[in-house]
Amino acid sequence: MKLMDRDAALQDLLEKHVFTEWIHDLALIENNFLTRQQAIEDELIAALESLCQLATLQHEQGRKGDIRYIYISLLRTRVVKNKAVYRIDAYDENWFLDETECAVEWSADFVFEPLFNRMTKLEKLKSDYARKITTMDIEQIQQIEAVKYHLLTVEFLKSQMPVFIASPSLERMPKANACTIFAGEYRDDSEILCRFTRSEGAETREGESSWIISS
């Protein structure tokens, strides 16, 4: 390999081993999902139901109000450790000022595994660049690439909202008149997955609530 300065070495690495490689990962992600589809879907719903049960318990203990927000957040600090962990939080009307923590974790490794495997290979390739590329560079590349995989995860989360909305645990959980589910990064940018609002004046059976679902 010809001698390169740091910028040239980094550009060479990106062009040869990063920029388009994520496209090849799509087939791997699809295969991961189809191989374990039922288990993957069940694990997400189980995590969400566990959150609802915890929020219901805290409400019964007088420690938390009616739930108004649910956040599903990628933990960037875990990505560095090759773990695709999402934290799922339930907040009452106090939002981030809600003092009673109500959170569970869920793993999206089935989406991120190809990324982690690629980054392991990049770590080995850096020796080809005569110390111009560092482990810190690889970690930064990983964080940038993670955005693509996070977006794929968000699409999966959206697809599972109808199942979650129909779950008994969510129905039993005390909710504000308007409740919104978000996905994003922890206490950072996020997008709405689903919003449900209590319907005023709708005919319901005794003990039931009527909700208007929107996305």
Task: Tell what function each PLM region has.
Residues 1-39, 108-122:
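Short, amphipathic alpha-helical segments
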Residues 1-21, 144-215:
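Acidic, proline/glycine-rich low-complexity IDRs
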Residues 17-67:
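Short N-terminal edge-element motif at the start of the domain
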Residues 32, 36-43, 141, 145-153:
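Conserved aromatic-histidine-acidic binding/catalytic patches
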Residues 44, 72, 88, 157, ...:
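Generic structural hydrophobic/aromatic packing signal, biased to beta-strands
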Residues 54-57, 77-81, 163:
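Amphipathic alpha-helical interaction surfaces
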Residues 61-119:
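Aromatic- and glycine-enriched beta-alpha-beta binding-site module
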Residues 102-144:
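Low-complexity, serine/threonine/proline-enriched polar segments
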